[in-house]
Amino acid sequence: MFLYRMPITGNTKKYKETTTGKNKTKKKMGLKHFPTYFPSDTEKEMICMKLNPSNEEELVKDYRKLQLLSCNQIKKQSAETRVGNRIVDHFTLKERLHTKGQQKIDFYTFWKNRAYFRKVPYIRKMLDFYKSRDTDEIRKFKYIFNLYLSSISIFRPILAMELYCMVSAKRVLDFTMGWGGRLLGAHVLNLESYIGIDINTELRQPYDRMISFLREREQPLNKQTQIQLIFKDALKVDYITLDYDTVFTSPPYYDYEEYRHMKQYDWKEEFYEPMIKVTWKYLKKNGHYCLNVPEDIYETVCVPILGQYHSKLIMKKKKRTKTANYKEFIYIWKKV
């Protein structure tokens, strides 16, 4: 899952760093632990409407904008381009806000306990900073949550479309489908098929609603993208029964993200290695295998199994600070 790892700015005294070999980890300091809060559907709807106030007319307009883009135009889109994002947020934001980041707290719990967080010095300072920029309280707290606690983002549909164009994808397998950006991109480009797999059964209803929206956008004379969604552990799927010429996914950054119903693995040995081996095995000849993974996973897992990448696509992201030199890639292999 795409994750922007926000650099911490200012003298918050929130983190201390420890170094083990090449890997640096940041430890939580000074924040009280709260039990996970599960709001009612009504409360979740209210929060999501504040964060993503969109209606069907706006969603359709966004979809049409994506449809009008050629592959060449898609390639030229900047990191600022948000077209299509509101569609994904409209259907899956409610579930995404349950996700815990590196500080082991989700946004619903953060918002529920805002009286405590208001008293944290650097959060109080940021609330004052945002006072003149956005009057809505929920949005202010979400900005701060993204900045200091966790910024778990969607995979932008426009970026998925760029990858599909780059490898001439027709039949896509996405074994950690996440929030729907890659599905939306496949549908807009009218690819032959999209197979999505996710263990989080809470996403079944949001995806059903998204697919209903997409079906209403289809042109009668066009061939429809065949969509198959499988809600189960990706390790238990029989891939020999699936037909795909492109694997494209963005697995969870297991040391940063914690989703509902997420299984606890030794991620390298029990998830990445067997998943890459089995999905590569049944990938069509001349097909493409595309992974958005951290550099250490690329080096320690992907290279021993797949060899060096044949090409890569940089993840276009906004530059939030002058020192934010972190780059993220989609690594691509062709099966010959």
Predicted regions located by residue number:
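Class I S-adenosyl-L-methionine-dependent methyltransferase catalytic core
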Residues: M1-V83, L93-V336
